[in-house]
Each structure stands twice: as C-alpha cells, then as structure tokens.
Amino acid sequence: MAQITLSAEIQLSQLGQRLDQALAELFPDYSRSRLKTWIEQNLVHVNGDVVNVPRAKVYGGEQIEIVVEIDDDTRFEPENLPLNIVYEDDDILVINKPKDFVVHPGAGNASGTVLNALLYHYPAIAEVPRAGIVHRLDKDTTGLMVIAKTIPAQTKLVRDLQKRKITREYEAIACGIMTKGGMVDQPMARHPTKRTHMAVHPMGKPAVTHYRIMERFRNYTRLRLRLETGRTHQIRVHMAHIAHPLLGDQTYGGRPRPPKNASEELMQTLRDFKRQALHAIMLRLAHPITGELMEWHAPLPTDFVELVEALKADYQLHQDDLDY
C-alpha cells in the first residue's frame, strides 16, 4: 500500500457545485466515482473537517485535503520509454519532451507517459510525489520540463514555482497578424460545460502571460511568451481570448487559415502540422539544493522548424504585395 495526499482549493467559479463534481475538476487524474467513494469513506477533509456527503455544496475558497491508501497494483507501472535528458544531477532532471507524449497518466492515458518512463529509468523516484513531476506540458506541446529526483528538491521547486521564481519561456505561432507585444492578465478556470477545457473566467485563478513579436508572416505571427503563472492550457486559452489562437490548436480555435494564393508547399505543411504550435524553449531556476542559478534551452523540433521555414518562404514570395 502507498499513502498519497491530495490538496487543493475550491475555485470561486465552482460556487454551487456538488463536492464530488468539484473534486473531479480539481483532480482530473482520478475518476469521479473513485472520488465519490473516498468522500463516503470519510477520507475527504474540507477546511479541516470530514465531509462524507458527495452532494454537499461548495462555495469557493474551501481548502481540500484527501489522504488515501492506494493498493500497489493500482499504482502506475514503470515502462521502458525513451527520455531526452538535457541535464541531470543527484537532485533534478531536465528533459526535452517530444510531441504526442502525455506527462501524467489520466483518463484515456493509463500508460505510455513521462511518469511511466521516470518510474522505469529512476525506480527510487516512486517515493517522490507524482514521481517528481513539478509542472506539466500538454500532450502535444514540446520542450523543457524539470523533474525532482528527491522529496527535498520537489518541495523547494514547487514552492519556487508558486512564488513565481521559475522562469519558463515558449515559442509559438499564433493565428493572425499581430502588431505589438503585450500581456494577458485574465483569470482562468475549468470551462463550465466542457470538463477537459479551460476558459477565461472572472472568478477563476489569476493567470498572466507576457508575449512579444519575433516575426510576422502572412496570416500568422511568431511569438516569444513568458509565463508568470502556470494554469492548465494557459498560453492556449489566453491567446485565443485575444483572438489570436495558436496555429493547429483544434481545442481553442486555431484551425489553419492559409493566406491568399498560398503555395502548395505551405498548404501541405499546414495540413501536416496536427498540433498546437507551442514549444517550451527556455527554463531558468535556482537549483533547489545548491541555489545555483541554472538555465537551459531546447531547440525547436523538426516539425516546428519546417513550419517556420514554410511560412517564411511564403512571406518572402508575397512581401511586395503586403502593406505592413
């Protein structure tokens, strides 16, 4: 048996929800039926008190803690999957995650994840909560992630992340021609009807994204972005909110929109790019044990490079026709 502790805060946007429904949104790695069972087994504490009624209403701001024993045979299995290691020492690991690679098992992805790979290559990491995973990247977002190999390292990294002391920068291709950089400061929460989606919501958690223009193409803009917070799908939601969704992001409206008279090469490149154009390109943090300031960069993956080259070639071919 292994004991795990889950903790979270009910969001104001969840006002009026059933407790089991709210927990299912806060802990998407666990099914609603399992969470309901834990509630009924007196394992869920709300503001320090046991609540064992799944239909109990929540109001926002409540502190949730769940302490539960999980059978070993229900824990995640080690799998011999490759990891692209950028840096490693006794305390931390930095990887460059490829596309089509889920970080943590969940509904529909019980195996084949970064976590499964970590358990195989680093068996001792099973003793660290979430196998040392400090932050996540979406399945089809590529780039840098830091992993804690020990509990002290994870505790410090999580604290630094919460205090916004870890710098994460991304490159992206956004739909539309943007004229200047800026900042999106809009709170976010789970979408009220689509549980797997996030949305800008006035009662959500604070979320801040900074962005600047690197390059303009016809119909698209290449961006460098910096996260001040790290909400699920934050960059994708924020860019869609300002009417510039990421190219290829089917969830938030980034369906490819080829420019007028686009070449067949560009058309084919856009058709072949079947994910959001987002890459975690830079990670900077203070080492959790030594305090040394460390920084890593991950080159753009091949499909992203090919996309940029095709957009650039199209722009150069038609630049005499442009008025910007």
From Swiss-Prot:
Active-site positions on this chain: D138
Documented EC number(s): 5.4.99.23
Reactions the enzyme catalyzes: uridine(1911/1915/1917) in 23S rRNA = pseudouridine(1911/1915/1917) in 23S rRNA
A GO CC term attached to the entry: cytoplasm
GO molecular function, one term: 23S rRNA pseudouridine(1911/1915/1917) synthase activity
Keyword terms of this UniProt record: Cytoplasm, Isomerase, RNA-binding, rRNA processing
Domain S4 RNA-binding, residue spans: 17-90
Top-level taxonomic group: Bacteria
Main location: cytoplasm
InterPro entries attached to this UniProt entry: PsdUridine_synth_cat_dom_sf, PsdUridine_synth_RluA-like_CS, PsdUridine_synth_RluC/D, PsdUridine_synth_RsuA/RluA, RluA_PseudoU_synthase, S4_RNA-bd, S4_RNA-bd_sf
GO biological process, one term: enzyme-directed rRNA pseudouridine synthesis
Subcellular location as annotated: Cytoplasm
EC category: isomerase
Family: Belongs to the pseudouridine synthase RluA family.
PANTHER family noted in UniProt: MITOCHONDRIAL RNA PSEUDOURIDINE SYNTHASE (PTHR21600), RIBOSOMAL LARGE SUBUNIT PSEUDOURIDINE SYNTHASE D (PTHR21600:SF44)
Role, per record: Responsible for synthesis of pseudouridine from uracil at positions 1911, 1915 and 1917 in 23S ribosomal RNA.
Name of the molecule in the record: Ribosomal large subunit pseudouridine synthase D
